[in-house]
Swiss-Prot record:
The family this protein is said to belong to: Belongs to the ETF alpha-subunit/FixB family.
Function according to Swiss-Prot or TrEMBL: May play a role in a redox process.
Keywords: Electron transport, FAD, Flavoprotein, Transport
Name the UniProt record assigns to this protein: Protein FixB
Binding site for FAD: 271-299
Complexes and interactors: FixA and FixB form a heterodimer.
Pfam families the UniProt entry points to: ETF, ETF_alpha
Superkingdom assignment: Bacteria
Species in which this protein is naturally found: Clostridium saccharobutylicum
UniProt-listed GO biological process terms: fatty acid beta-oxidation using acyl-CoA dehydrogenase
Record-linked InterPro entries: DHS-like_NAD/FAD-binding_dom (IPR029035), ETF_a/b_N (IPR014730), ETF_a/FixB (IPR001308), ETF_alpha_N (IPR033947), ETF_asu_C (IPR014731), ETF_asu_C_CS (IPR018206), Rossmann-like_a/b/a_fold (IPR014729)
UniProt GO molecular function: electron transfer activity; flavin adenine dinucleotide binding
Electron transport found in the keyword field: yes
Length: 334
């Protein structure tokens, strides 16, 4: 492998039922920064059938959009998407490939990396690049979250990383000079070992906590499911959303869809109220960029206090009723 032959930054533009996923636009924002630093082109890779969203990709930083349009790509399947992406990567030799750490990206990324005989750093929290050699420096928690590891893949290309939604910011550009190219798709029956027959959507009304402006989150220190209901009451008064740590999810106090942290979702609300959360690095990685962090904990030395803008030392079940009462009083007086 001649490393010098591999240039450019690619972003897999994930779409579901024709709708671009937010993480793809966020990755374009970070991809734009990396591409500018290296002085290379930023390419969005869009797969689907009668796909839309090209304009959005152009207006969020892409220099070029490669469109693989084929009826067999209408719905995501591992085999078909892997084949198309690997064929394009082998032909055009990108230096870096970013994929969103969604349920699709977590299935697709490792398969593509294995097929291309390269490495992949999963669930990155930050990304940088060495200009001299083009090496991608991907940082993520390691060893149970006890340290942050920066991982490089200097001997193989393309360098790959997955990033969860909410980690990076979108950028806006005019998109006037973005080039759109339709690429040939070569798929045979042997490449299509699975087929989507029907998509049945969940009837549950799940709130996307990554979009919430105010989050009241609870951890092990809340103590019980009954106490967890206090979080819901405070969130309702403030017009916010309830979330939880991994410990709260494992205890069955809140559903997995509302988990914040390295194994949950990354959030950036205006206000994040952490109730009974100790502040493990895995959790902090998912909420540390909140505009304001308020921590409620019996232990004034808990790690969460170090990242909080305001700390309240006390038992959640005693503090929350007071907060709820005062919030109601202030709101009713306005």
């Amino acid at each position: 492998m001649n490393i010098a032959d591999y240039k450019g930054v690619w972003v897999f533009a994930e779409q579901r039922e024709g709708e671009l996923q937010k993480v793809s636009l966020e990755l374009l924002g970070e991809g734009r920064r990396v591409a500018d630093k290296l002085g290379v082109k930023l390419t969005a890779l869009l797969l689907g059938s009668n796909v839309e969203g090209i304009k959005d990709l152009a207006e969020h930083g892409a220099d070029e959009v490669l469109v693989a349009d084929n009826k067999d790509l209408q719905h995501y399947t591992t085999d078909a998407y892997t084949k198309v992406i690997c064929d394009l990567a082998n032909e055009r030799k990108p230096g870096i490939l970013f994929v969103g750490a969604t349920f699709i990206g977590r299935d697709l990324g490792p398969r593509v990396a294995a097929r291309l005989n390269t490495g992949l750093t999963a669930d990155c929290t930050s990304i940088d690049v060495e200009v001299e050699n083009g090496d991608l420096l991907a940082t993520r928690p390691a060893f149970g979250g006890n340290l942050m590891a920066t991982i490089a893949c200097p001997e193989h290309r393309p360098q790959m990383a997955t990033v969860r939604p909410g980690v990076f910011e979108k950028v806006n550009t005019d998109g006037a000079n973005c080039k759109v190219e339709k690429v040939e798709v070569k798929l045979t029956n042997n490449d299509l070992r699975t087929k989507v027959l029907e998509i049945i959507k969940s009837k549950k009304d799940i709130v996307d906590i990554s979009e919430a402006k105010i989050i009241v989150a609870g951890g092990r220190g809340v103590g019980s499911k009954e106490n967890f209901e206090l979080l819901g009451e405070l969130a309702k008064v403030l017009g916010g959303t309830v979330a939880g740590s991994r410990a709260a999810v494992e205890k069955g106090w809140i559903e997995n869809a509302y988990q914040v942290g390295q194994t949950g979702k990354t959030v950036k609300p205006s206000i994040y109220i952490a109730c009974g959360i100790s502040g493990a690095i895995q959790h902090v990685a998912g909420m540390q960029d909140s505009d304001m962090i308020i921590a409620i904990n019996k232990d004034e030395t808990a790690p969460i206090m170090k990242v909080a803008d305001y700390g309240i030392v006390g038992d959640v079940k005693n503090v929350l009723p007071e907060l709820i009462a005062q919030a109601k009083e202030i709101i009713s007086a306005e």
